[in-house]
Amino acid sequence: MPHSSDTPSHALKADSFGRILLVEGPAGSFVRRDLGATPLWLRLPAWWLARREARALRHIHGMADVPQLLAWDGRHLDRSFMAGDAMYQRPPRGDLAWFRAARRLLQQLHRNGVAHNDLAKEANWLVTDDGRPALIDFQLAMIGNPRSRWMRLLAREDLRHLLKHKRMYCRELLTPVEKRVLKRTSWVRELWFATGKPVYRFVTRRILHWEDNEGQGPKP
């Protein structure tokens, strides 16, 4: 059952798809995605995204360095709190060990049959308080057979996004193989940039009025 809605909390983030709250419960802090404040015309897509996240978190329950699903009742999604900072807040500059650990984390996620699908956003990568990588925000995640051609393609796109971050913060430590992966684009990427990306930008910037470089962090 979901945690009580009258427990003390404060907002971490609010956007058109609801509020993200840090809630103080009897067993400690947890994070709640609250769809109650979502405008009526966005409630269906907000519910669909939250349901998708709940399904992915349920699938990888028990895995380290990802949120643990606590409850989902159609209005509130409760997940475990992970202490740390978003990548853009504490960049892992020159930290090869962090990027190696991040790649191992991705490999484990993919072996469990989940592709994240939203790792271009630095806000979805955490640097935990003890320096480990962690992943959050599984609203766009996909579940499937990790050996299928489609899931292997999505896993490769997840890896490409990680390598783009490594190129940003650790460029001199990219391996020859990683450089080749970055150069080789897939038809999924090309289709997204040709069709989905313009629609995404129109909706998020013209309709929803988002201004944060697609989740990488707030503008100063």
Language-model region placement:
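ATP-binding glycine-rich loop module of kinase domains
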Residues: 5-58
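C-lobe/activation-segment region of protein kinase-like
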Residues: 128-220
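A short acidic, helix-capping loop that chelates divalent metal ions and anchors anionic groups
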Residues: 39-43, 88-89, 144-146
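Short hydrophobic-acidic sequence motifs that mark active-site Asp/Glu residues
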Residues: 22, 29-33, 66, 78, ...
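Conserved hydrophobic "DFG−1" position in protein kinase catalytic cores
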Residues: 22-25, 34, 71, 80-81, ...
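Catalytic-loop of the protein kinase fold
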Residues: 111-128
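Conserved structural core of kinase catalytic domains
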Residues: 36, 46-50, 56-101, 105
